[in-house]
Amino acid sequence: ENNYRRTDLLIETIKQLNTEKYGFIIIGAGKNKPDFSLYNNVYDFGAIYDTNIKRELFYIADLYFQPGWVGLSIVEAMAYGKPICTFIRSEETKQCVEYSYIENNTNGLIFTNIDDCITRISQLTNDEIKQLGANAKKKVAQLLTPQNMVANALSIL
């Protein structure tokens, strides 16, 4: 059974980060979804389709963390000004095309392993998070609007 989203890395991150300082908001459903009820700092909302609720959850989040198989959801997170955190593309950690939108240390963080992840998240300052988020929002505004995507596609033809 495939676990492209690397929920094992998510669970390991939840376990290793300070539970008093870090909370996790989980949105989504699926057969590989772990049981998050074991963790008192994890808030599992399941599948959400109401954009108002999603907007509120993005508003209170500091980072968007998806260990593997990042897809279109990162564009939404970037539009909300959230830095993207994921693991480097490898044989074990597959990534979608949207992975290329993440610029390490500019609009997000790309981790090499779990120790790198824990260290870098733990050392992030609020100012760094704000700057990464502002850069993420700027990238979406400049490059990833539907108009620009159409223009880029047409330029190839």
Positions of the model-derived regions?
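Nucleotide-activated donor-binding/catalytic signature segment of Leloir-type glycosyltransferases, i.e.
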Residues: 33-52
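Short acidic/histidine- and often glycine-rich active-site loop of Leloir-type glycosyltransferases
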Residues: 76-79, 90-105, 110
